[in-house]
Structures are given as structure tokens and as C-alpha cells.
Amino acid sequence: MEHMMKEGRSLAETPTYSVASVVTVLVFVCFLVERAIYRFGKWLKKTRRKALFTSLEKMKEELMLLGLISLLLSQSARWISEICVNSSLFNSKFYICSEEDYGIHKKVLLEHTSSTNQSSLPHHGIHEASHQCGHGREPFVSYEGLEQLLRFLFVLGITHVLYSGIAIGLAMSKIYSWRKWEAQAIIMAESDIHAKKTKVMKRQSTFVFHHASHPWSNNRFLIWMLCFLRQFRGSIRKSDYFALRLGFLTKHNLPFTYNFHMYMVRTMEDEFHGIVGISWPLWVYAIVCICINVHGLNMYFWISFVPAILVMLVGTKLEHVVSKLALEVKEQQTGTSNGAQVKPRDGLFWFGKPEILLRLIQFIIFQNAFEMATFIWFLWGIKERSCFMKNHVMISSRLISGVLVQFWCSYGTVPLNVIVTQMGSRHKKAVIAESVRDSLHSWCKRVKERSKHTRSVCSLDTATIDERDEMTVGTLSRSSSMTSLNQITINSIDQAESIFGAAASSSSPQDGYTSRVEEYLSETYNNIGSIPPLNDEIEIEIEGEEDNGGRGSGSDENNGDAGETLLELFRRT
């Protein structure tokens, strides 16, 4: 009985109510978390936030990966701890803490391996390791060391998920604060043309004054120092938002009534999928940090300042892009006073790739999470932590720096990156509303399925569809709250081209939106391999709740303004 009390009771010798109580608590907690994640995902699908739902799925994949690692490590820990190597391979230079911190002398460590294991292993693990390894040999990784590693990986994954969620939450709150500016811009676009031009020119002048009036702005070296200081004053101003918005709409030939703010929100949701999750380069970075974290280097202390340096570097670059655009507008105003506006292009960014800044932000968030995870691990997973906690100044500076940088990056740098990276040469796929994209995918999918059952001939060069075949495509919903159904009916092989025929014959900026749809359709057609010719009109009929009948050729006469072209629907979205 005394030997049993020292080593602990087995499951067979434990009362059943104790085992049942532990299982009940574990099942209840896991079920509660699983239901919460399920409800949140269901709400995202209901509100048609497909990008955020995809990000949630990626977070679930990360948690599943951590669970798999924990399962494998827990099941193989006993086997790994039985791998014995010579004690001479354990050089104290590669210890996290020095021997003095543990209070262990080198002679005792080398000559009395069993006693050393007894000071660092649980009693049950020591008993097995000492008999298996023998004199002069010891486990490659002890059982307790594997348990501590398991705790660290678990804390790292949970901390990274929480930091990613906090970053996106703060960034979204900042971006949503710009909605009032977007509403003003749309009202200006719908108001008198002369008044609109006057206000736009005023905003452009204010934008140039804020970013190009300082004497350092004309010096190619001092402007970097100026941009470095400007990033501390906060996010963008109203004049900056108006100028960048106008440049984006003009660059991509979009109507001035286009909702640029909703486009940024959709873009942010898409980019969230890239921020969430620990990619394999980040895992490699974490492994390297664990490997080189030897005593005397204070590696974790020095790398804790890497996020602060990168945040300032990214913020300076974003401010430099805005300042360069303002200087170009200023030069245009001195030359030709009419038509001065920003000119977005990829050449403004490093290596012509705006996405590099997003990757740096992803690394910043991971490094901050890694810093906090190591601190929690030291408190929770290591009993003898004298070498980790003896310098309170270093610990405090690491924690304060990590928290401040995380808040600064989330609330300032990420929103600024979202709007400034739109100044590249290409637009994101979010330029078209998600409901329209889903409907276009549904349309192309049905075209492909129908073509298999009709007398159609499809090839890489040509594609024809039977004129007598009528294809009804899925619902086009302009909002999740609408109860009416918008359907597309194609009555002949030449009924689809009028969307783009009207765009080709018009020079209005609004028709540029149709070209975006045409690009999207072309990419989708290339993916499915069947390209129906676009020659005639596509008619959209809106069926209300009271209309339960079929659709005929005389629906325009019966419903008045119910019929509309797909081009008009694209413009409204």
C-alpha cells in the first residue's frame, strides 16, 4: 500500500465516481467549445460572410493539428523517453539554463545520471529510465521534458488563435469607423456635378497639403524620416480616404457611387484567411528559436523587439506610398491644374508586390503570440524557473513591448495596410459582391451541366448551345434580407453578350465595373472549360412573394419595371 501511494493508483484502483467526474467535466467543456464554434460558423454563413467562415475553418484546422500533435506526443512520450544516448552528448552549452541556475554540478551530472534524472523526472518515470538506460546513458528527451513541450505547443497554438482574432477585431473596428466618410462620398457623387468637383478638388488639395507641404517631402532620403514620424500620429485622415478612394475608382473605371468601404471590408475578410493559421515557415522559425535559445544569449529577449522594428518598417513604407502619391498629385497640379489625381500602381511597393506587407504583418502577429506563449509556458510548465524569472526588468520590457506592438499593429498598421495596398495595379476579387460571384459560379456550373445533356458542341476554341434549350440559373440575392428571387433566363445562344456589348459602346466610368465582371466570367469560363458565346440580352425577372407562377415572354408587360438587365444589377451591387 505504501508503494502504491508513492507511485499513485492505477485506473483500476481508482473509484469509479472519480473517473466519471473527470470524464464528465472534460466532455462538457469540449462539447461547449464545439457548440460555440458551430453556432458562430452558422451565424457567419447566415450573414453571408463566406471569407470569415473560411477563416474560421482554418482556425479549426489549426486546433485540430494541435490536437493531433498532442495525441501523438502523449502516446509516444513513453517510447521516446526510452531512447537512450551517451551522457557525453549532453553538453551544458546547449541548456536553456546554466548549471548554476539549477544548483547542479557538472561532475554529478556526468557521473550520477540516475540521481540527475531523479531531480528532473517524475518518480514513476525515473524508475523506468534508470533501469533502461543504465550507467553513463540517459534518455534523449525525458518524459517530463516531453510533457513540458506538449504544454508549450498547446499554449502557442491557443495564443496565436487569440492574437489573430484580436488583431482582426481591432482592425475591423477601425475600418468600420470610416463608413461615415464613405456615406459622404456617395452622397457627393449623387449630388450636383459641379459641387462634387469642387469638394473633390478641395479634398485633393488638403491631401497634398498634409503629405507634400513639408520641406523634407522633396528630399528622397529625408522623406523616409518624415514618414517614420508620421506613422505615430494615427491612421489616415478624411482627406486621405477621399483621395485614395478616388484614385482606386478612377484606376479601375468604377462608378463614383461604388461602395469602396464595403470592398475594403470584403478584402479584409479575404486577407484574414492568410493571417490566421501557423504556416510551415512559421513552424520552422519557431523550431529554430527553440534550438538556439541557449543560456547566455537571452535570445527570447532580443527577438521580442523584432515585431516593434517590423511594425515601424511597415508603417513607414505605407506612409511613404501615400506621400509619394501626394507628391505626384502636387506635380500634376503645377503642370496641368485639371485632372490631378493619384495614380495607383505596383511599383510603389517593394519588389512590385503589395502582398509582402501582409506577410510581414502575419509574422508580427505570430512573433507576439510566440512571446506571450513562452512567458505563460515558463509560469505553467517549468517548476525550476530561476533562470527565466530572475531578471524582472527584461521580463517586464518583453511583455510591455509585446502588448503595445500587438495593439499598435492591430488598430493602426493593419487598417492602413488594407486601404494603402489597394493602390496597386490590380484589384482584388472582392471588387464584385460575393452574392454576384456565387450567382456567376452557379450560372457557369449550370451551363456546363446542361451542355452535357443537350446537343451542344464545346471545344477550346468554340462553344455552342442549343437554341431551344432554356437554362435557369441560381438566385441572385442583393442582400440576405430580401425575400424576392432574382433569376436569369437564357432563351437563345446569343442572349448573353449584351452585358458586355453595352459596356463596349459606352465611355462612362460605371461601365468599367462591367469589365471587372467580364474578367471574372472569363476566369470562371477558363476553369470550367466551356465558354458559351455572349451575343444577346440576359433578362432578369424579379418574382415577388405573391408571384408563384411561371415566367413567360410577356413578363415585362405584366410586371412593368420588374425586368432589368444584369448590367444594372452589377452596377447597383
From Swiss-Prot:
GO terms for molecular function: calmodulin binding. Its main location: membrane. The chain crosses the membrane at residues 14-34, 63-83, 152-172, 272-292, 294-314, 360-380, 400-420. GO terms for cellular component: membrane. Residues 35-62, 173-271, 315-359, 421-573 are cytoplasmic. It is a multi-pass membrane protein. Keywords: Calmodulin-binding, Membrane, Pathogenesis-related protein, Plant defense, Transmembrane, Transmembrane helix. Residues 542-573 are annotated as: Disordered. It comes from the Eukaryota. It is found in: Membrane. One of its GO terms (biological process) is defense response. The keyword Zinc-finger does not apply. Belongs to the MLO family. May be involved in modulation of pathogen defense and leaf cell death. Activity seems to be regulated by Ca(2+)-dependent calmodulin binding and seems not to require heterotrimeric G proteins. This is MLO-like protein 4. The lineage of its organism: Eukaryota, Viridiplantae, Streptophyta, Embryophyta, Tracheophyta. The gene is MLO4.
